[in-house]
């Protein structure tokens, strides 16, 4: 069978070659026998081609149903063919002149030739185009179905007729109405037209043409061939779809569908009036040039007044091949269809209207914003969703972002390529190497503190801070020196501190505290490292040990480069001996309702529920500190932490604790790379009293703010919410607490920002969002903070698979029902099939402290609300995570962006080169709700325990509220016309007295501005 096919193919090729050879031989023989005939045929064919091409370019196909003037030459077809021959001769004349375009033309000679064939008209713009004039707006019959539109149309027509007469021209109204008593025509094209009498007045060379809302049905190129001044009132839409009380329109293909109240529907094409010049070719082959002027009408923004004014006539056909750009200036129909999209773009104001072909709706926005969103969507590493577009529109303050985002998203689908989201290990940055401002080491090779175990789920994943000399110096600069707080407490706050100490340690337990014995300390230390440290130093431990503070960079990941966080370790003897005091003290603190360290997850959730029940008419306030450890001033420690400890313990133990306290707050320290520094009174993050210090400082600030609001001591104490280190959640008491707490922390030298959370929204505390603490224990890890860190672990002492499994075991315990996070953990455990082994202390803690999770649907809905995405998108992303088959195939599900706050080297590039970047906390993303700032002083009928207006507190700002934009001042009966290319407003003229009334309504005035549209 194959041999037969091969034979057929060979025979076919042989026959084809033979036929070609015979044909070439015959043509060559014919050329030798009849050379003149063949030459004439070739030249004739070329000329015929040029004639047909030029004829088609100049004389386009006309719609036989369009309005055309009855005046004109006879034998139009013959004239056009004759003109096409003239154009062909001009083309060959040009080719000979420029040697078929090989040499540039002589512009001086071309201009001299064209000058001899140019007939110019005087500039008619001063006569016909308005200059700060007014138009009488005539009232319409009250029974009219769309009276306002009719008023504009009739008034514009009357104005154009009068202005033409003032200029010395008799008006000729095309498709005239009953109110037109001048020359014009009226033909019958639809049943509605038979209600008026037929007219067809002759057109003279002195007429000026007036088109009022009818040019859509006219062949404007034929009318312009009369070379007469032409004035129009016409629809020039700025959007693809529009509606008001009287009319609405939309585009279907390149036609506009116009509906009016009363049931009328009109469908037609529009003329594209653009630029400052219009060209037309008349039936005699002359090029006619017109000036074009446009004016917008305020109050009737979808219509314009347009003037097409004769400027010059060129009779030499050489214009068709010269540099006149006549073809680009021809008046053509407006086209909005571009593939599957419909687009209207006004380049001067950069107003863009875009929609899908076949849709009745569109989106109006700035062209720059559209291009920015399109570019960001097309460059996404992850699959784009409607929520991505919605978020970008909202950030750009786009008014209708909810309804416009889905429409705009579908407009991108053909242009945006959806790429696979697989990112191979090693193709993304893992660490950043901080560079200090002063004396950095240029030869240092920093250490990689962790290891990557999977591909990241975000496009720009979190980074480890590299360790070394430069990192230590950057830490000192950013975490200690830059935020150092030496502010003294004002007298009022010294008094508040004394009250606070007495409330923490009431009289009933003051002086009763007894430190634990050394043996009890070992029993309470449940970590292996703690017991090993105890066993190593216990036999030789002395009460006179000198503390040695050594700081190291904490192995953790950051969303972007910033000053690394340090841990200040104490001498083991100091840690053990101070624990003898801190452990019994912690038991006292745990009895305080607002004190959350030591509480289990359910107890913390119950406390949050109690906070949420306070002042339910106002928002919840989430505390957000920046570098709290570094901003502790001496007064915070000396007026709060130290007095509380000294007040609780019996007198015989106070001296020893004071010595330990002085050793903890020793003023000399060194880093792991040997850099010395002065920590002053900053919180010692590696001491046994670290959590106590941060939590007490935070709670005191809340207490002081409540006291400033006028609450008495007991009420202020009872209203303190939930506090854990630098995390806090409080009711926004009286709607003003957030202002007072920010004021207090500012006065006391700390860096704080209130994040207001509307009731019903998930609440953020301890890096977790609580769905609804009042009704549910459900919570989930802060999504973007957690998802960006899933791909790496600080544990370098295990294999990649074991490191991934250890991390997954922790999250399967705390977030098994959390979308994406729980899916990642389950998939990692299914792939590795490993149990927990040799995990870090943090991983062990996570595995042993499960946050309750029950309602998966509620968690998913809350997470979607936090991420501002659709639940369907979250489900799709969750499914994408569950489909991977290896650790290096996890997809990118979110786009993230680095916001570097520290000069550093990342993946071979220098980032954060602006050394004066504002410091921000890396604890969580911003969730501040700016729409609910302070409204003023507390209400007098508020809490019965609240006092009067505080004498010293934050300034009272106005609450931002949403509402309608106020109406523009001015006479509503005065309408203004502005230049179509300008956004400036026109100063209103002196108000005119109504001289006449028609139909019981005064005559209005329409004002417009004299400036050109480019």
From Swiss-Prot:
| A Pfam family annotated for this UniProt entry | RdRP_1
Highest taxon of the lineage: Viruses
Bias class Basic residues marks the residues at: 956-967
Q: Which reaction does it catalyse?
A: RNA(n) + a ribonucleoside 5'-triphosphate = RNA(n+1) + diphosphate
Q: Which GO terms describe its biological process?
A: DNA-templated transcription; viral RNA genome replication
- Outline the extent of the RdRp catalytic domain: 618-740
EC category name: transferase
Disulfide bonds, paired cysteine numbers: none
Q: Alphabetically list the UniProt keywords.
A: Nucleotidyltransferase, RNA-directed RNA polymerase, Transferase, Viral RNA replication
Read off the InterPro entries from this record: DNA/RNA_pol_sf, Noda_Vmethyltr_dom, RNA-dir_pol_C, RNA-dir_pol_PSvirus
Tell me a Gene Ontology molecular-function term this record carries: RNA-directed RNA polymerase activity
- For this protein, the Enzyme Commission number is 2.7.7.48
Q: Where is this region: Disordered?
A: 918-1014
SUPFAM superfamilies recorded for this chain?
DNA/RNA polymerases
> Which CDD domains does the record cross-reference, listed alphabetically?
ps-ssRNAv_Nodaviridae_RdRp
Q: Which family does it belong to?
A: Belongs to the nodaviridae RNA polymerase family.
What's the stated role of this polypeptide? RNA-dependent RNA polymerase which replicates the viral genome composed of 2 RNA segments, RNA1 and RNA2.
Q: Which protein are we looking at?
A: RNA-directed RNA polymerase
Q: Please tell me the species this chain comes from.
A: Pieris rapae virus
